[in-house]
Amino acid sequence: SVPCGRDGFLAVNSTIASIALLAKALFEMTNDDFYSLPNDFLRNNITPLERGKLQNLLKKDTVIVLHGGITTSVAYDLESKFSEVALGNIQLVDFRNFAHGRHYWISTRADETAILMLVGPDENSIAKKTSCILEGKIICESLSICEENVIGLLKMFVDVFQLVSFAGEEHNIDPGCPKVAEFGRKLYHLSYNPCTAPDHRKLKKSI
């Protein structure tokens, strides 16, 4: 069990605990400062997001989340949280693939779409150029970190948790304790272990 207590529906405590445990193990193995954890992260490293800045973004049906490098894992976590609690539709795309075709979505659906850029140090340049091109065409906001290490990663996760909380308030949903339908509870308790499924390669079945 994690010392921070029981998880809510979105398993925020477990997410942070897993990152911390993995970083601690990798630091002990490699002695690489990239994985070094601070002793007082919650006290000194959390900066509240400006809700007003994100209000218009949260009103849109679809949010395209641009990511790259260290922010990729955070992007996937954000998508899972929005989907699991029905906060909105999220499209995940890295900056390169957005530039190479995925931008067409906003050519026809700009009124119902916003863009959120998750920006690490390596993405600063491309994020600024992308933002300049899109200015005035679509709502475009960003969450940024300065550190290319596990501390920066944790900061970005905390920003995303705040964003999910804002989205919940916008849609009158408690992301940590949504009203789950009875069929959802039955699905959750279905027994299925892929490790015990037949190995069709061993059964020599042709495709």
Q: Model segments located where?
A:
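A SIS-like phosphosugar-recognition module
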Residues: S1-S36, L42-I207
